[in-house]
Structures are given as structure tokens and as C-alpha cells.
Amino acid sequence: MATAQPSQVRQKYDTNCDAAINSHITLELYTSYLYLSMAFYFNRDDVALENFFRYFLRLSDDKMEHAQKLMRLQNLRGGHICLHDIRKPECQGWESGLVAMESAFHLEKNVNQSLLDLYQLAVEKGDPQLCHFLESHYLHEQVKTIKELGGYVSNLRKICSPEAGLAEYLFDKLTLGGRVKET
């Protein structure tokens, strides 16, 4: 295997930032993979919550797009894309919409922390281009996603009980159904 040649376009792009972006790409891919698992759980015939399916499928697509955007940045800046193994989701059956939404909420907070750490590294390494990229494409969107999921979790907690099948069905149709059609 040939050793990679140094990039001729690389300028003031610290190797630590390069490595941190590769780590964040892995996190975005894992998140996409996990949301795909959630989506198709809700698409099963014995679960049949169509709008949960659509919602998590859209989140999966968004996370894949985020990973690809970071890969394009790596190439633009003269970095080297180094893909890592994507671990298997710990949970395969999501039990309920509430459990899935809570998992998504905590996952998005982890993604946000990774982005904040990456941003801080870019500041420390004096990389205004990376700071601007993260501000323009990720940070605000991430906060909006956390807020949205937090609201969904709060609403589901209010309406869910041990036998909350009807409440979950109504949440799927009325809340997520309207949300999916807007996008």
C-alpha cells in the first residue's frame, strides 16, 4: 500500500483537527446507522408507526449528509479521510417511541459535545475556516435538533403510561405526522 503524499492544498490545517474530524465523521455515521435501526423498527408490521419510521429515517439521512459534508471538508482542506469501524447499535428493539426518542435525545447531546470539542480545538489551533464551517453548518442546527427532541421526549413522557399504545399512536399521527409533512 502506497504512503499518502502530502497534500499541496493543505494550509494551516492542524493534524489534530484532521484527526478530530475523522472521529466526528465516525460519530455521525454511527448516529445515522442507529437512526436507521430505529426507523426500521417502527416500520415493522407488529409496530407500524409510520411517522416514527419517517422521522428517524430523515434523521438518518441528515446524519449521513453531515458525515459526507465533513468528508468533503477534509478533501477541500487537504486532510486525509480515515474511516473507522462503525459499532453495532447496543439496542435492536426500541420498546416504545419514548425509549427511542430518549435515546435519540441523549445521542444528539453527545454529537453536540463532540462538535463543541472540535470547535474548541479549532479555536486553540487558530483555524478560523474550520470554526466558520462548524458555525455555518452544524452548531445551530444541532441545538435545534436537541430542542425538538427534548420537546418530543417531554410530550411522550406526559402521555405515556405502561399501556400507552393509543397515546403513542396519536403522537405518531398528530405530532410527527405534521412534522414529517412540513419537511
Swiss-Prot record:
It comes from the Eukaryota. GO terms for cellular component: cytoplasm. It comes from Homo sapiens. GO terms for molecular function: ferric iron binding; ferrous iron binding. The gene is FTHL17. GO terms for biological process: intracellular iron ion homeostasis; iron ion transport. PROSITE patterns: FERRITIN_2 (PS00204), FERRITIN_LIKE (PS50905). InterPro entries: Ferritin, Ferritin-like, Ferritin-like_diiron, Ferritin-like_SF, Ferritin_CS, Ferritin_DPS_dom. Residues 11-160 form the Ferritin-like diiron domain. Fe cation binds at E28, H66, E108, Q142. Coiled coil: none annotated. Keywords: Iron, Iron storage, Metal-binding. Testis specific. Also expressed in several cancers. Belongs to the ferritin family. The keyword Magnesium does not apply. This is Ferritin heavy polypeptide-like 17.
